[in-house]
Curated annotation (Swiss-Prot):
Pathway note: Amino-acid biosynthesis; L-arginine biosynthesis; L-arginine from L-ornithine and carbamoyl phosphate: step 2/3
Binding site for L-aspartate: T118, N122, D123
Entry keyword Ligase: yes
Subunit architecture: Homotetramer.
Organism, as annotated: Clostridium botulinum (strain 657 / Type Ba4)
Alphabetized GO MF terms: argininosuccinate synthase activity; ATP binding
Protein name listed in UniProt: Argininosuccinate synthase
Enzyme Commission numbers on file: 6.3.4.5
Main location: cytoplasm
Binding site for ATP: A8, Y9, S10, G11, G12, L13, D14, T15, S16, G116
GO BP: any one term: L-arginine biosynthetic process
Keyword Transport included in the entry's annotation: no
Subcellular location: Cytoplasm
Coiled coil (residue ranges): none
Length: 397
């Protein structure tokens, strides 16, 4: 009986040719696993293609709701970003995929897990560290670090040689990653920084100049930091993301052209479409500015950056990530309320906030006197607050 390998399968170029390559070079029984995080593929087609390519079995795991609740909601609550711009659409999906791969490897008693990540990318780290953190005995096969195929053009040629149908041409080659949260585009003419990216590549977003000519008003209701209602309507987690992707996309919201520092050392360029995430982060940030005290709000910004770094680097299965989640959950206890946004041709304008947990008090914040604040109190405060500056000036006078 042949030993088994669990292959992270998408039906795309790389994983399509890996199946015959594994059988040819390792003589393994290939178990394909497609983790459905909302990439929008025809899963019946993916199943058929995996079997036709030589897999003995194909699992399709629909984890969209788990992806939103256990991963994306953590992103929203923490407002995690990598290098201030990247909303981590790929990064948040990878640990969930690694989790499912390990679960199925255990079920199938497979000794190997294989992925189609390139030897220059971050995903190889995310998958492999994720697997090792759950089961250090599983062996990894990473074809892009082993085989003679050195480019996507070579991969297309090999696909033709082994009879695997791949809907990619050499004339227009982009590496695309899609899920509920985002679409990323890399490679091809994007690798030349002198090239403006082409707007016809967009899947989710209408180019801002072609977006609706009238503004759209949007209300998002959060409960303890998580979105639960859109325009007054309760929706399930997946439908919330889908609806906001539609609303944001038709208003030209959520495009980012980013140069990022990869974990493996080089810089790379990516075009990201994240309409729902962009709307949710903007609304959540506004609500937090009203409901969090100054020091928690400021410290959380530091934690958010650290959280984004951890997720980007594939360190999901760590004590620090769990500890940050616990801290973030504590900060979200009063992040409940409705934020109204005005959307127009790629721009987001927060219009209003309605929450019973507001730390903003109109009476105190106005220029008039109040029971809690006297203008006369300011003089003593300024004298004490500025004392170090005054002492230094006196010494140097």
């Amino acid at each position: 009986m042949k030993e088994k390998v669990v292959l992270a399968y998408s039906g795309g170029l790389d994983t399509s040719i890996i199946i015959p390559w594994l059988k040819e070079n390792y003589d393994l029984d290939v178990i394909a696993v497609c983790v459905n995080v909302g990439q929008g593929d025809d899963m019946d087609y993916v199943k058929t293609k995996a079997i036709k390519s030589g897999a003995s079995k194909i699992y399709v795991e629909d984890v969209k709701e788990e992806f939103v609740v256990d991963y994306l909601y953590k992103a929203i609550k923490s407002e995690a970003l990598y290098e201030q711009d990247y909303m981590l659409g790929t990064s948040f999906a990878r640990p969930l995929m690694a989790k499912k791969l390990v679960e199925i490897a255990h079920k199938e008693q497979a000794k190997y897990i294989c992925h189609g990540c390139t030897g220059k990318g971050n995903d190889q780290v995310r998958f492999e560290v994720g697997v090792k953190a759950q089961d250090p005995t599983i062996k990894i096969i990473a074809p892009w670090r082993i085989w003679d195929i050195k480019s996507r053009e070579d991969a297309i040629d090999y696909a033709k040689k082994v009879g695997v149908e791949v809907p990619v041409t050499k004339k227009k080659i982009y590496s695309v990653d899609k899920n509920l949260w985002h679409v990323s585009h890399e490679g091809g003419d994007l690798e030349d920084l002198k090239n403006e990216h082409k707007e016809d590549m967009y899947f989710m977003v209408t180019p801002p100049e072609k977006a609706k000519d009238e503004p759209t008003y949007l209300e998002i209701y959060f409960e303890k930091g998580a979105p639960v209602k859109i325009n007054g309507e309760f929706l399930n987690p997946v439908d919330i993301i889908d609806k906001l992707n539609t609303i944001g996309g038709e208003n030209g919201i959520g495009i980012a052209d980013i140069i990022e520092n990869r974990l493996v050392g080089m810089k790379s360029r990516g075009i990201y479409e994240t309409p729902a995430g962009t709307l949710l982060y903007a609304a959540h940030k506004k609500l937090e500015s009203v409901t969090l005290d100054k020091y928690t709000y400021q410290y959380k910004k530091l934690v958010s950056a650290q959280y984004g770094e951890l997720v980007y680097n594939g360190l999901w299965f760590t004590a620090l990530r769990e500890a940050i989640d616990a801290f973030v959950d504590k900060t979200q206890e009063n992040v409940t309320g409705t934020v109204k946004l005005k959307l127009y041709k790629g721009n987001i304008k927060p219009c209003s906030v309605d929450t019973e947990y507001a730390l903003y008090d109109e009476g105190i914040s106005s220029f008039g006197e109040s029971e809690l604040y006297s203008h006369k109190d300011a003089e003593g405060f300024i004298n004490l607050f500025g004392l170090p500056c005054k002492i230094k000036a006196l010494k140097n006078f």
